[in-house]
Structure formats: C-alpha cells, structure tokens
Regions:
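Structural helix-boundary/capping segments
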Residues: 1-14, 25-30, 34, 90, ...
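Short connector loops at secondary-structure junctions
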Residues: 36-53, 82-86
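Short helix-loop capping/hinge segments that flank enzyme active sites or metal/cofactor-binding pockets
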Residues: 1-8, 55-110, 122, 126, ...
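Short, surface-exposed loop/helix-turn segments at secondary-structure junctions
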Residues: 97, 129-150
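Small-aliphatic-rich amphipathic alpha-helix that forms the alpha element of a beta-alpha
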Residues: 144-167
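Short glycine/threonine-rich loop-to-helix capping motif typified by GTGT followed
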Residues: 18-20, 49-59, 130-136
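Acyltransferase
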Residues: 18-42, 65-71, 95, 99-116
Length: 249
C-alpha cells in the first residue's frame, strides 16, 4: 500500500491508561507492514486545547439552554447546568482567544496532512467500564477535571473539524473491545471511509485484530430480571423518590 500514516497515543495532551497504550501499539505494529509509511506525528498541541474545548462547548450550551437555565433551571440536569454556568463566567476575550486557538489547531492538523493520508490514535483512554458508571472519573491515575474530560482523545479532533471514525479492532488485554480512531483530511470523508474499509478487510482474518463479535449464546440468558425497572441514569437499582419508574425503553 502507498498509504502514509501518522500515529499518536495521546496527542501529547491527553491522559491514557496503560492497557489502552499497549493495545494501540499492537495495532500500530500491525499497520507498519501494510503501509508505505507509519511514524509518530507531533501535532504540537498544548494543554490549551482543553480550555479551548471548554469554552466552545460552554458557548454552545449557553446558546441551546440559556433560556431554560434562566427560567426553569430545575428542568436541566446537573451536567447541562454546569456547562451553562461555565459559560456565564466566560468573557468576550476568552471567546476571542478560543476561536483563534481553534483556528491554529485546525492549521496544525492541515499541515500534518500535507505529509500523511491518515492519522490514527486510540478512541478512548480507558478500557470499557460498567454501564452503571456514567463516565470515567480518572484516567491513568489522573482525576477527570469534569464529566467529559475523559473524551479528550476525540474532542481534540473535533476542534480541528476533521472527519474521524472508530474502527472496531480486536480486544485489549482485559478482553474488552478496542477501537482505533482513524482521522482523515478535512472534507476527506469518503477517502477516510475507504481507508477504514480497507483496514477492516485486511484484518478480518486475524482474530486479534478483527471486529469483535458478541457471543450471542452467552448473552442469551440474562443475569438479571429484565422485567424489573431499569433506571437511567442508574441509581443503584433504585428509583429516586417521587420520580416514578423510569425505564430504559
């Protein structure tokens, strides 16, 4: 293949668990023999990327939920309220800086794609966790700054606005499904899908790299009584007082 690939475990600014780094390195090693070039890429990101995303996200939440926050704050969940509250503390100077910095980030990605056809990274920084946990509270021993901080491997790509997808790619050392994040050139959605399909087909015959398939026989019998109410978000199997029976369907 003539494909030129740049890879990064963490974009230089994202915490990532050791089990994910190990799984990612295995996939990179598998790529090296199939492409013309596979080397580390430095996108020159700094911790400012997190602040940029905080500001732009808060700005979007204020636009969407500002009126509800002012008139009926009790109608919003705690995470939405936290995002809107963050927005109320942001200045015009903060917004101007964030938009300029986002442009700089987009240009760094554009420069990288002058050399590479594809950039790969992990999708998430942690192995899949229990559905009863709403988000990862820490990554690699680092406490999360907020409920979405653990998604930084993908939101730094969102800042660049490049197309990206998750390619299911075997399992990690814990036996949990692993995803490879594939990032393409700006407006290169079709080319990205084509590269993803080629990789998926190339690895389809390798049990360690192929898309994990659920064991339907093992899942056929539920370990819990599916007739019981399922709360969402999970409340340790209980329904909040006065809330009624909230179900998953």
């Amino acid at each position: 293949s003539s494909l030129k690939v740049g890879f990064t475990e963490d974009f230089g600014v994202c915490p990532v668990d050791a089990v994910v780094r190990e799984a990612f390195r295995t996939r990179v090693a598998a790529l090296e023999g199939r492409v013309a070039l596979c080397e580390p890429v430095d996108l020159a990101l700094t911790d400012d990327a997190h602040r940029v995303f905080d500001i732009l996200r808060a700005e979007a939440f204020l636009a969407a939920y500002g009126e509800a926050f002012r008139s009926a704050p009790e109608s919003l969940g705690p995470n939405v309220r936290a995002n809107v509250e963050m927005a109320t503390a942001i200045t015009l100077a903060d917004r101007a800086w964030a938009h300029l910095e986002q442009t700089r980030i987009a240009r760094r990605f554009a420069r990288a794609f002058e050399r590479y056809d594809l950039i790969v990274a992990p999708v998430t920084p942690v192995s899949p966790f229990s559905w009863t946990e709403l988000y990862a509270t820490e990554v690699d021993g680092v406490p999360a700054r907020n409920y979405y901080h653990w998604l930084s491997l993908t939101y730094v790509v969102t800042l660049a606005t490049n197309p990206a997808l998750s390619l299911p790619c075997g399992r990690d050392a814990r036996g949990m499904p692993f995803g490879l994040q594939l990032i393409g050139r700006l407006r290169g959605d079709v080319a990205l899908l084509s590269m993803a399909q080629a990789l998926e087909q190339a690895w389809a015959g390798d049990a360690a790299l192929a898309r994990p398939v659920p064991d339907l026989a093992a899942l056929a019998r539920s370990a819990v009584d599916l007739k019981a109410p399922v709360t969402h978000p999970p409340l340790e199997g209980k329904v909040a007082a006065g809330a009624g029976a909230a179900t998953a369907v």
